[in-house]
Amino acid sequence: MLCRKNFFTLSCIFILLVAMMSFIKPDKKKKIIFFGDSITQMGMKPGGYITQMDSLIKKEGIDNYQLEGAGIGGNKVYDLYLRMDTDVLSKNPDIVFIYVGINDIWHKVTHGTGTDPDKYEVFYKAIIKKLTDRNIKVVLCTPTVIGERNDYSNQQDGELNMYSNIIRNIAQKQSIPVCDLRNVFIKYLQENNPTNQEKGILTTDRVHLNDKGNLIVAQQMWKLIKDVR
């Protein structure tokens, strides 16, 4: 009789636990969207910075982030603004990395287009506002390099520094985290490019990242993700 009572009690406890488990929802993964140009578009491919970041996260035994790329080759800051409703806001992200600026500078030389600094700042701030109005956390990224010479002799170094300062100033005034890839790349090239090569250290063609360049971006962004609350 005692055994039957114990069995009945254990059965009830088991049923209760199963019922409780059915009401417990798994933790929702934080959705992070990386919003940018061809560097971000390639970031989703093998060896890309988003793919490498996903591997870094999994190596730490973490499984509560969902990484998505929203990069399109050739995009400038106004392209991002025009497509952000469809490519970003509709997906309800928790965090968005804004990583744009290379084409705004580079295309002035290669295509005769580009984006003037004042217009760049206006569109950049407009993107931020649309995100923060939706309570989406934002991380800003400075552009990396157009040419890897470490003595500031690359043609667009001056403009890269100018546009990076625009981003840094916005970040400071609005208390937004900034992933300062420009500074990180400059420091790395000063220490690891003794022959002052134009490409091949962190990029394949002066602009688009090789595996090492992608890894550095992944590492820097992952550090910031862990601090975003």
Positions of PLM-derived features:
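Bacterial Sec-dependent signal peptides at the C-terminal "C-region" and cleavage site
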Residues: 3-29
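Short catalytic-loop micro-motif centered on adjacent basic/acidic residues
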Residues: 41, 68-71, 140, 208
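A short beta-strand-loop structural module common to alpha/beta enzyme folds
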Residues: 61-76
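Catalytic nucleophile-elbow at a beta strand-turn-alpha helix junction centered on a G-D-S/GDSL motif
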Residues: 30-45, 73-76, 105
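Short Gly/aromatic-enriched secondary-structure transition segments
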Residues: 48-49
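Alpha-helical cap/lid subdomain in secreted, periplasmic
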Residues: 2-5, 25-27, 52, 59, ...
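A structural signal for the hydrophobic beta-strands that form the central parallel beta-sheet
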Residues: 34-35, 69, 140, 203
